[in-house]
């Protein structure tokens, strides 16, 4: 693992950006367990090893990088792994699901209604795997947040604002809770119609840490390009130009939306 990840200055004058912009290259941490996936899983596995668990259970979508990372780590550490997958099992597995099976991960496919039934899933886990450690979807628990706090701890320079993508809000909570209160954290929400995400993140943080999250967060809802994982030729062209100018690969679901947000360009 390449830690701490490098902090690189970006030359974005081509895009009309005049301010100094730096990017924390968590995409270089590991070829598979990269980005915030390692951040959110690292402390969870520390907790797992410090307790007498016999396996790991989690959840995710069929294209989730969380399940890909979790399956890989469990395989490397010889930890039994069970993952509930949202949606019916496809006739042809995608590359992520194929790799999970190669890693000897047990995949259980659930309908969307069954997948959202938390009580039923808890009962299944307790009945079949009572001594397995449960990691929420995306690693969105206390240890996931604490892992993301390490991002700020690795930055030894002053900055005015920090931007991140927002899915579950775990990374944003980690950043906001470890920043000085005078530093602004802006979250680019990747889901359409997720206006309640701020309340969810705040409520979850209070439940986990018994204190409110720093009041230094702004959620940006207008950069999802029509909804989660949706994209246009405009977005694809931006990805190509951005890679040509910076050498940084982005994806149309998360990281690209971060760079198409107003960020320093319009601030």
Residue ranges and their predicted role:
Residues 89-157, 218-237:
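Small/polar-residue-rich loop-to-helix segments that shape phosphate-bearing ligand pockets
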Residues 259-267:
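Single conserved hydrophobic/aromatic residue that forms the stacking wall/gate
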């Amino acid at each position: 693992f390449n830690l701490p990840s490098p902090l690189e200055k970006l030359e974005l004058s081509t895009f009309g950006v005049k301010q100094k912009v730096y990017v924390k290259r968590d995409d270089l941490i590991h070829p598979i367990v990269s980005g915030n996936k390692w951040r959110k899983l690292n402390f969870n596995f520390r907790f797992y090893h410090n307790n007498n668990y016999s396996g790991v259970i989690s959840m995710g979508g069929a294209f989730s990088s969380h399940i890909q990372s979790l399956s890989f780590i469990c395989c490397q550490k010889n930890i039994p792994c069970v993952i509930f997958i949202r949606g019916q099992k496809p006739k042809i597995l995608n590359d992520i699901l194929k790799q999970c099976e190669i890693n000897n991960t047990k995949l259980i496919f659930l309908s969307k209604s069954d997948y959202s039934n938390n009580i039923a899933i808890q009962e299944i886990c307790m009945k079949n795997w009572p001594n397995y450690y449960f990691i929420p979807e995306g690693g969105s628990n206390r240890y996931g947040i604490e892992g993301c706090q390490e991002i700020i701890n690795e930055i030894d320079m002053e900055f005015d604002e920090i931007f991140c993508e927002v899915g579950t809000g775990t990374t944003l909570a980690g950043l906001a809770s470890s920043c000085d209160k005078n530093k602004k954290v802006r979250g680019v929400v990747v889901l359409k119609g997720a206006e309640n995400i701020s309340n969810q993140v705040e409520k979850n943080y209070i439940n986990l840490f018994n204190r409110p999250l720093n009041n230094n967060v702004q959620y940006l809802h207008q950069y999802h390009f029509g909804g989660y994982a949706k994209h246009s030729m405009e977005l694809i062209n931006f990805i190509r130009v951005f890679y040509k100018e910076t050498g940084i690969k982005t994806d149309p679901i998360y990281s690209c939306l971060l760079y198409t947000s107003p960020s320093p360009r319009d601030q």
